[in-house]
Amino acid sequence: MRPLAIVGPTGTGKSDLALAVAGLLSAEIAVEVVNADAMQLYRGMDIGTAKLTVVERHGVPHHQLDVLDVTETATVARYQQAAAADVEAIAARGALPVIVGGSMLYVQSLLDQWSFPATDPRVRTRWERRLAEIGVAALHHELADVDAAAAASILPTDGRRIVRALEVVELTGQPFAASAPTIGAPRWGTVIVGLDWDTTVLDERLARRTDLMFERGLVDEVVGLLGVGLREGVTAARALGYAQVLADLDAGGDGSAAREPTFVGTRRYVRRQRSWFRRDHRITWLDGAAGGSAALADKVIRIWRDVS
């Protein structure tokens, strides 16, 4: 049985669509979801990641949720190994694995059997020290000097990925992209469906989504996570919403001023997601406005059946 993947930008309704698919298939086959959202890996990061609550999951098993403490570093390599094991275990018990998420590298690592270059802690530490010394913007310029393509694909604010790219270039003598997978037949023959909306409509959805996060207590969630080490987290503290709230709190605010930069940052991230996923010719795209969740789920199932 071929797995199903539902991918696309943030805020498009992928999680709800997966549940609707599970509901329509419930009389025929069990469905289990494998999360492909990097920040939903973290325990306690619920409101700012729009993570479904246990009640909202309606009894559908979800994997790769709440598997890391905020002090732990999320890595694509670790996720790839753990999520692949989940997919294969789900299929082995006769259920349908449905991979759901929009974290671009995580999705690709799972579907394209990405091989990751080795890491050297000494080299990594040296570049991390360099980052601390000169700052993320200057280090991004240094990456551009040795690997212009990598610099063009990595945000100049993403210090962790800049360090990793410089580490790979130094260790392999090759461009960072040389370690990336080429798009071929997806692993396990996975059927990939993309969900998107018109840009104007999605921007409105993102604004409502951001407002709702702050209304539901994102600031309190961040404050609570500070007590368990959020500030020490390499990846968790940089998550959209969390980073903006932290910055406002550090500036003496109460966190409420983080709403607008969170929305702007999310909208910018969505543009990157859309550009990334639209390059993948294997994805069959659906318009989120083309019917309710049941109608969209029916389309997804028909696409899956046609290929399977």
UniProtKB/Swiss-Prot annotation:
GO annotation terms (biological process): tRNA modification
Site (Interaction with substrate tRNA): S103, R124
Amino acids binding substrate: T10, G11, T12, G13, K14, S15
Entry superkingdom: Bacteria
Record: residues binding ATP: G8, P9, T10, G11, T12, G13, K14, S15
Documented EC number(s): 2.5.1.75
Catalytic activity: adenosine(37) in tRNA + dimethylallyl diphosphate = N(6)-dimethylallyladenosine(37) in tRNA + diphosphate
Top-level class of the enzyme under EC nomenclature: transferase
HAMAP family: IPP_trans
Subunit structure: Monomer.
Function: Catalyzes the transfer of a dimethylallyl group onto the adenine at position 37 in tRNAs that read codons beginning with uridine, leading to the formation of N6-(dimethylallyl)adenosine (i(6)A).
Name this polypeptide is given: tRNA dimethylallyltransferase
